[in-house]
UniProtKB/Swiss-Prot annotation:
<dbReference type="InterPro" id="IPR005813">
    <property type="entry name" value="Ribosomal_bL20"/>
</dbReference>
<dbReference type="GO" id="GO:1990904">
    <property type="term" value="C:ribonucleoprotein complex"/>
</dbReference>
<keyword id="KW-0687">Ribonucleoprotein</keyword>
<dbReference type="Pfam" id="PF00453">
    <property type="entry name" value="Ribosomal_L20"/>
</dbReference>
<dbReference type="GO" id="GO:0000027">
    <property type="term" value="P:ribosomal large subunit assembly"/>
</dbReference>
<dbReference type="InterPro" id="IPR049946">
    <property type="entry name" value="RIBOSOMAL_L20_CS"/>
</dbReference>
<dbReference type="GO" id="GO:0003735">
    <property type="term" value="F:structural constituent of ribosome"/>
</dbReference>
<keyword id="KW-0694">RNA-binding</keyword>
<comment type="function">
    <text>Binds directly to 23S ribosomal RNA and is necessary for the in vitro assembly process of the 50S ribosomal subunit. It is not involved in the protein synthesizing functions of that subunit.</text>
</comment>
<dbReference type="GO" id="GO:0019843">
    <property type="term" value="F:rRNA binding"/>
</dbReference>
<dbReference type="GO" id="GO:0006412">
    <property type="term" value="P:translation"/>
</dbReference>
<comment type="similarity">
    <text>Belongs to the bacterial ribosomal protein bL20 family.</text>
</comment>
<dbReference type="InterPro" id="IPR035566">
    <property type="entry name" value="Ribosomal_protein_bL20_C"/>
</dbReference>
<protein>
    <recommendedName>
        <fullName>Large ribosomal subunit protein bL20</fullName>
    </recommendedName>
</protein>
<dbReference type="GO" id="GO:0005840">
    <property type="term" value="C:ribosome"/>
</dbReference>
<keyword id="KW-0689">Ribosomal protein</keyword>
<keyword id="KW-0699">rRNA-binding</keyword>
Length: 116
């Protein structure tokens, strides 16, 4: 007996078209174009999950540097002083303090002043 792919093909097409929701025009409606766009979008998603980490770290560095320069020091000297003073605050927390709680950031800066 010959095996036909009707059910399997329908299931596979439905799966791809379901994932392609939100794409424009034929990239949403036509299986072949949707499949190509889906492969590309999965590549972008994979790549950008890695880039996101880099971009956030650089954003934190910029914010910490801006707050440090308001108090007459540089980012690199501040981070070195933190390490010497054995204060283990990460960049994410420091950037949040610099943006939302300047008083706390200033107290940390005063705490490491002698190590600058």
């Amino acid at each position: 007996m010959r095996v036909k792919t009707g059910v399997v093909r329908r299931r596979r097409h439905k799966k791809v078209l379901k994932l392609a929701r939100g794409f424009y025009s034929g990239r949403r409606k036509h299986f072949r174009k949707a499949k190509e766009q889906l492969e590309r979008s999965m590549y972008y998603a994979f790549r950008d999950r890695k880039q996101k980490k880099r971009e956030f770290r650089s954003l934190w560095v910029v914010r910490i540097n801006a707050a440090c320069r308001m108090h007459d020091t540089s980012y690199s000297r501040f981070m070195h002083a933190l390490k010497v003073a054995n204060i283990e605050l990460d960049r994410k927390i420091l950037a949040d303090m610099a943006m939302n709680d300047m008083q706390a950031f200033k107290s940390v800066l005063e705490g490491v002043k002698e190590h600058l």
